[in-house]
């Protein structure tokens, strides 16, 4: 049996990217579950059929806490999806493994802090700092991808 693909690229950037990106996708699922739990606890449903199932049409309403969860999830989609593309392509540029791991780790930790700050209603500027820190490795990877692509035109 041939060795697993990840064994062939160990010591390179791809395994670190796969770990961080998978953990981030799991985090997004957790935020979605939290959103559902907050909806149930606050009895604030987006659809009439859900409200009817849980007590009546009066529960088809918005709620500040549900909206906060939705904004956190939307922000995840706005930042994590681009990271998935950038990190994947960047992994194949042959970056220094340690530097690549730091890019992925900084993004991962920034997004974790951002989510905790958003859902936990932490004081400003915690959330915006976490957002900014997480965007730095994305900008770095994007610039390196553009540079490499331009050099090979």
Curated annotation (Swiss-Prot):
Site positions (Essential for protaglandin-E synthase activity): 50, 127
Record's subcellular location: Membrane; Cytoplasm, Perinuclear region
Residues spanning the membrane: 14-42, 62-91, 97-120, 125-153
Keywords of the record: Cytoplasm, Fatty acid biosynthesis, Fatty acid metabolism, Isomerase, Lipid biosynthesis, Lipid metabolism, Membrane, Oxidoreductase, Prostaglandin biosynthesis, Prostaglandin metabolism, Transferase, Transmembrane, Transmembrane helix
Recorded metabolic or biological pathway in which this protein acts: Lipid metabolism; prostaglandin biosynthesis
InterPro entries named in the record: MAPEG-like_dom_sf (IPR023352), Membr-assoc_MAPEG (IPR001129), MGST1-like (IPR040162)
Molecular functions per Gene Ontology: glutathione binding; glutathione peroxidase activity; glutathione transferase activity; prostaglandin-D synthase activity; prostaglandin-E synthase activity
UniProt topological domain (Cytoplasmic) ranges: 43-61, 121-124
Amino-acid positions noted as binding glutathione in the UniProt annotation, renumbered to this chain: 39, 74-78, 114, 118, 127-131
E.C. number(s) listed in UniProt: 5.3.99.3, 1.11.1.-, 2.5.1.18
Topology in membrane: Multi-pass membrane protein
Lumenal side: 1-13, 92-96
Cofactor needs: glutathione
Biological process annotations from GO: cell population proliferation; negative regulation of cell population proliferation; positive regulation of prostaglandin secretion; prostaglandin biosynthetic process; regulation of fever generation; regulation of inflammatory response; sensory perception of pain
Catalysed reaction, written as an equation: prostaglandin H2 = prostaglandin E2; 2-glyceryl-prostaglandin H2 = 2-glyceryl-prostaglandin E2; prostaglandin G2 = (15S)-15-hydroperoxy-prostaglandin E2; 1-chloro-2,4-dinitrobenzene + glutathione = 2,4-dinitrophenyl-S-glutathione + chloride + H(+)
Any one cellular-component term (Gene Ontology): membrane
The keyword Ubl conjugation is annotated on this UniProt entry: no
Subunit details: Homotrimer.
Family label: Belongs to the MAPEG family.
Function comment: Terminal enzyme of the cyclooxygenase (COX)-2-mediated prostaglandin E2 (PGE2) biosynthetic pathway. Catalyzes the glutathione-dependent oxidoreduction of prostaglandin endoperoxide H2 (PGH2) to prostaglandin E2 (PGE2) in response to inflammatory stimuli. Plays a key role in inflammation response, fever and pain. Also catalyzes the oxidoreduction of endocannabinoids into prostaglandin glycerol esters and PGG2 into 15-hydroperoxy-PGE2.
Record's protein name: Prostaglandin E synthase
Gene: PTGES
